[in-house]
Amino acid sequence: HRLMLEKADEILVGVQILMKAAKVTKGYIGIENNKPDAIKLMTEKAAAYPGIEIVPLKVKYPQGGEKQLIDAVIGRQVPAPPAIPINVGAVVQNVGTAYAVYEAVQKNKPLFERIVTVTGKSLKNPSNFLTRMGTPMSQLIEAAGGLPEDTGKVIGGGPMMGKALANTEVPICKGSSGVLIMNDKEARRAEPQPCIRCAKCVSACPMGLEPFLLATCSAHGDWERVEHEMIMSCIECGSCQFTCPSHRPMLDYIRLGKGKVGGIIRARNAKK
């Protein structure tokens, strides 16, 4: 959000470079409606860049997923893996990548820094930092006011798809987007209960999967069944776990299953 407000022209130039590399004449920048200032600014700026259109999007999670973006912006659906966006004539990049492309091409600047958001209810000074790769997350947390006393977990990434960190000395890398500090109350997990077959997770899944089945089969090591049930199509958005009234750790089990099935598929392909 801040990048679009402060580096709009640079992002648009980066998009033009990406369009030229992909040999396309049309580019879209999708922005959710809860960022009206960014939509207004980018729309005004984009008028000077032929072929680039700003598309306001409905606010819903996970709207930022590449398959969801392609469907929302150009109405094309990406088939199940191994299909990728290029199979439907699309390439998806985020504005951070577009800005990095601009700096690499126009300024001959390698990717050695990126914007990282440090936030949390108990933080004294939640901020966005321009951070060099390799910087320990502890330094960013100190710059944001230090680790609060009621810290329960430190999450690398966002609240839905992020992963808990064992310690704060984990370095920033090119894929780091943010650091979330959760207090004790937020970090506390409810005791998991048996699945009640309510199907809320099925309704919440943006990929049309059956998360309760994937989680149960993964917990029992039934890798053949979870592969058949398209576990590799899961985008790990966490919607299933968030909606589960039984507080089952479905995403944890599904990530385990994806890792196992991915290994099985690679071994199978290596034999061909």
Predicted feature locations:
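Catalytic cores of large soluble enzymes that bind and process phosphate-bearing ligands
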Residues: 3-10, 30-34, 89-97, 128-132, ...
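Short, solvent-exposed coil/turn elements at secondary-structure transition points
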Residues: 58-60, 160, 184-185, 220
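Generic beta-strand/beta-sheet core signal
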Residues: 30-32, 55-57, 119-121, 132, ...
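Hydrophobic alpha-helical positions that pack around
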Residues: 23-137, 143-148, 158
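Ferredoxin-type iron-sulfur electron-transfer modules in oxidoreductases and energy-metabolism complexes
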Residues: 176-192, 202, 206-272
